[in-house]
Amino acid sequence: MTTPFQTRRDFLKTSALAAASLPFVGALAARAQTAAPGRKLGFALAGLGSLSTNQIAPAFKKTNFCQLAGIITGTPAKAATWKAKYNIPDKNIYNYDTMEKMADNPDIDVVYVVTPNGLHADHTIKAAKAGKHVLCEKPMEVSPEKCQQMIDACKAANRMLAVGYRLHFDPNHLECIRLAREKVFGNLNMIQAEYGFRIGQKQWRLDRALSGGGPLMDVGIYALQAARYISGEEPALVSATQVNNDPVKFKDMEESLTWQLKFPGGVIANCSTTYNFSGFDRLRAFADRGWFELAPAYGYGGIQGKRSDGKWTPIAGIDQFAAEMDDFAQCIMENRPTKVPGEEGLRDLKIMMAIYEAAKTGKTVSLT
């Protein structure tokens, strides 16, 4: 690799150029490779931080349809480490300046974008231009406009785009959805969803240019997602309150946030998130004749369920990342839609912007 590495922060400066180059996607898309029958799809990880290192890369060993084929990083030392650990050939190692060269690499079918939130559009657009399908970590981006750019880029390239909503594949969450849809306890009335932790001082998540916001964009999105898929509806109204007890550490973002969603069918969801304390990890739904809950609810493992009639059957955990990658690979190979498309990420961003507006103004915001 002779091309100089480009850092994530440097990449922020070139986002406009990436969006402007969309008209040239078509020609490159025509060269995109589709996986041959019987082989696993090759994934390239863009961004080699803690999530990729500790969760996603190990998950490949548990997949049936995926393999780690390449990496994209702005840090040469990481490239060397990953090359040695995962036996990645030099031709499958890229930096953020050379992503377009993936267009000529049939080893790579999918780019899994795991960079900071504010870089997702840049890296997704580059991957789509290279003719690759994209799985992008949540939140999809930092604004609805950026999300739409990502959707448009992948559509123009005729490539699939999915958002890394791992809990859509977790059996405990799927059981809660079943209990709600089948009205096991009658009609749903209220949802409580909360998730947060105490964040350290030196985190890219405290840089608003990269994160787009505070805990809402990071872990609060899980509570928002849960409210949406448990209710089975899209919220109509939102109100919110923001708390900042440490204005130095959280100088340009929320420290803690609570919000209420009102759904068309009458369900109310009370949600909370924080960056100031831990032990905040629960989902509970109340219906006419009982309730069901997950506590802890949103982690990579150890999710525990309970229901008011005592009939919750323990469900063995899975590797959520392996499940989401396998599902996306199958969607690509079978040419069927993913249940977590870019439009799902766009909906979350629109709601989160409304939550921020409600917290800032103190007024109820309409989402219809």
Segments and roles (model prediction):
Residues 39, 51-52, 160, 167-251, ...:
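Predominantly a Rossmann-like dinucleotide-binding segment in NAD(P)-dependent oxidoreductases
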Residues 15-87:
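N-terminal Rossmann-like dinucleotide-binding module
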Residues 45, 95, 136, 161-163, ...:
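Hydrophobic residues in well-ordered beta-strands that form the structural core
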Residues 1-19:
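N-terminal secretory signal peptides and thylakoid transit peptides that target proteins
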Residues 109-110, 116-117, 121-168:
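Beta-strand-loop-alpha-helix segment that lines the small-molecule cofactor/substrate pocket
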Residues 91-97:
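Conserved SAM-binding strand-loop segment of SAM-dependent methyltransferases
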Residues 247-254, 262-325, 341:
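NAD(P)-dinucleotide binding in Rossmann-like oxidoreductases
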